[in-house]
């Protein structure tokens, strides 16, 4: 008898918890709730993507649905008043009552999208969910800068750059269609070379080029959306002709010496001295000084007589 009495007391003590649980479940059922099958979709440019927004619980048969786009700190409408808005108009439709499907996505569609549902007949009338869309862009043809010729033992830098791909591409270099390792020391095949490849910046740096480094080089830029390569370009590694350089310098010095000697000889012979007029030079009078000059036929010379000016 005492045992059954204790059991009844325990049941009575648990009744409030039971009623609270029922009340809580009732409130949950009467509150609108959303979920998404993929809150971080990733898609390649020019493909289609679905932005999933699913109502799991609601007592409202016709809730109000809105979609907004958040990009660079600005919020704009995507779906409002049962119409697609903004730059997504014409390539977006609504499916499953609350989800969006975007056709022919572009890189400008990368943003955070917010699905908002207003259910006026529910205790909790509003719920929202955010979805981050990432659009990956295939790289375009990279720009490669490759020196045409480099002397043996000198440093050389090959550059590869691409600016359109997203996420940022990684770079790899090829010589005669053979991929180059990041570090030449890591592969015995390139033991005669001394280079390093930076896959982030696209540079290929030779510390000291060797004859075996001659060949055709090209670069490939790649990311998750695809890859692109530049046209192959030849790089020649040549030996320095020391004897030829010395001979050329000697020839220049000899030519300069011959020219100098020729100038000196010409100067000694008076080729650079201006000839003077024969006889005595005279200076023409600058102004009339009051003296008349009379030439006599007997003397054949100039004589003067004084004249007085009154």
Swiss-Prot record:
Proteolytically cleaved from endothelial cells surface into a soluble form by ADAM10 and ADAM17; the release of soluble JAM3 is increased by pro-inflammatory factors. Pfam families: Ig_3, V-set. GO terms for molecular function: cell-cell adhesion mediator activity; identical protein binding; integrin binding; protein heterodimerization activity; protein homodimerization activity. It is a single-pass type I membrane protein. The keyword Signal applies. It is found in: Cell membrane; Cell junction; Cell junction, Desmosome; Cell junction, Tight junction. Coiled coil: none annotated. The chain crosses the membrane at residues 242-262. Residues 263-310 are cytoplasmic. Residues 1-29 form the signal peptide. This is Junctional adhesion molecule C.
